[in-house]
Every structure is written in C-alpha cells, then in structure tokens.
Amino acid sequence: MTDSNLDKTLVLIPARMASTRLPGKPLADICGLPMIVQVAKRAREAAIGRIVVAVDHDDTYAAVANAGFDVVMTGMDHQSGSDRIHEALRAVDPDGRAEIIVNVQGDLPTIDPETIRASLRPLENPAVDIATLTVEIKDEEEKTLPSVVKVVGSAISESRLRALYFTRATAPYGKGPLYHHIGLYTYRRAALERFVSLGPSPLEKRESLEQLRALEAGMRIDVEIVDTIPLGVDTAADLEKARRILSGASR
C-alpha cells in the first residue's frame, strides 16, 4: 500500500465499557495488555492507515493513550458502533482527508492482520459502498445458530459475494455453502455519512442487524471471503480462550 493510500485510510476501533455480559470488557487483561490495546496492535500490524480508538470512559482513554495509540472520547449513548465511529471520525478528521474508514470491532483481540487488510479489496470497485467479510461455515451446528449471522449473496468471484441479505436464520435454503458474517466494516466516507443519517430500518430492527439498514437504502455491500474467523470476546469463557490463543502466539 502506498503512502498516499495510507493517508486516505483511517482505522477506527470503538470500545464501549458498558458490556452486559462482560463488564469493563475493553480493559480485560490478555497477556499483560488490555484487550482494546491488543486489538489496536493487530490493526497496527495490518499497516493500512492511521489508527484511532474511540472510547467512552476515562479509564479506557488512559489505557489506550499509555500504550501509545491515538484515542478520542465519544459519547456514552450511541446505539451502535457505527454511530460511535462517526462521532470519532468528525472529531479526528474534520477536514475530510480520510476517504476509507475501517471499523474494527474492539472485542476481536485475535484478529489476523491479513483479515483486516482483506476488507479493503472490495472497495477497489468504485460501485461498492461498504465492504465486509465472511467465512464458509464448516460446523453443522453453526448453520442453525441465531448468534451466527449468515450472508446471503451472489458470487462475484471465488473470493467475493455481493450481499443480498444478512440473517440469523439458516439461509439460503438448499444445497451449497453457508457463510458466517464477520462484523468488520470498511466504508467509503460518503457511505458512512449516509448510513448514520438514516434511521434504523424495519429489517434492521427485526433481525437486530444494522447492516440491513444499508441494504434497505439501496447501498451496495460486497463481502470478501476469508479463511479464518476471529474470536469475538463476549463472555468470560471467550476471554479465557483469547488468552490461550495469544499466549500460544507469543511463544
């Protein structure tokens, strides 16, 4: 990636302290570092642009700043991570230099930097508004779990889909692969601005999936198929698993 592209790409990592299942989640210790710092390190290893962490608590702000990463304070009342990163974007880039905004969830401490880089590829097509990621489901149980969001899409190539729908149901019906959505989004700046200006859509509210707001508004989402799915830390058990993974990686 050229220096020019690095200047035009901004990685924003939202961190919310008020997790119901794992209170104080961004500061949970993983191998001697707060989880949010581990995520920021993975983003730095991806080397795609400036990294800013968007926080809502003084303790998180201090932890991120002490680790040497850029950080911005945001409000506590955001309904989604997209709303939080939009506030952060306006604060850290008011002049509009950044053209591509990468939203890396703050609870993915084991994410492969190459997975982050992969999210940029669909935006090489100027017709695409938003890019995201998916992995083929191999576990039969996952195919019916509502917690595993499925991508329904038309194949553009062996490694990419054009999203038609996202659902917690088992879809599409019939023989063929099913795809597990990875909640990392890369936006064109104008697409993010438009997205947050729209109110929650009917299907978004029904499925509790904010990306449906974009599809209902006629925005194009392309989905890059990757090989591995990062561990999302939502529970104490997830946290222990993340510690084991990163402990093994550091040896």
Curated annotation (Swiss-Prot):
Pathway: Nucleotide-sugar biosynthesis; CMP-3-deoxy-D-manno-octulosonate biosynthesis; CMP-3-deoxy-D-manno-octulosonate from 3-deoxy-D-manno-octulosonate and CTP: step 1/1; Bacterial outer membrane biogenesis; lipopolysaccharide biosynthesis. Its EC number is 2.7.7.38. It catalyses: 3-deoxy-alpha-D-manno-oct-2-ulosonate + CTP = CMP-3-deoxy-beta-D-manno-octulosonate + diphosphate. GO terms for biological process: CMP-keto-3-deoxy-D-manno-octulosonic acid biosynthetic process; lipopolysaccharide biosynthetic process. Keywords: Cytoplasm, Lipopolysaccharide biosynthesis, Nucleotidyltransferase, Transferase. It is an enzyme of class 2 (transferase). GO terms for molecular function: 3-deoxy-manno-octulosonate cytidylyltransferase activity. GO terms for cellular component: cytosol. Activates KDO (a required 8-carbon sugar) for incorporation into bacterial lipopolysaccharide in Gram-negative bacteria. Belongs to the KdsB family. This is 3-deoxy-manno-octulosonate cytidylyltransferase. It comes from Rhizobium rhizogenes (strain K84 / ATCC BAA-868) (Agrobacterium radiobacter). The gene is kdsB.
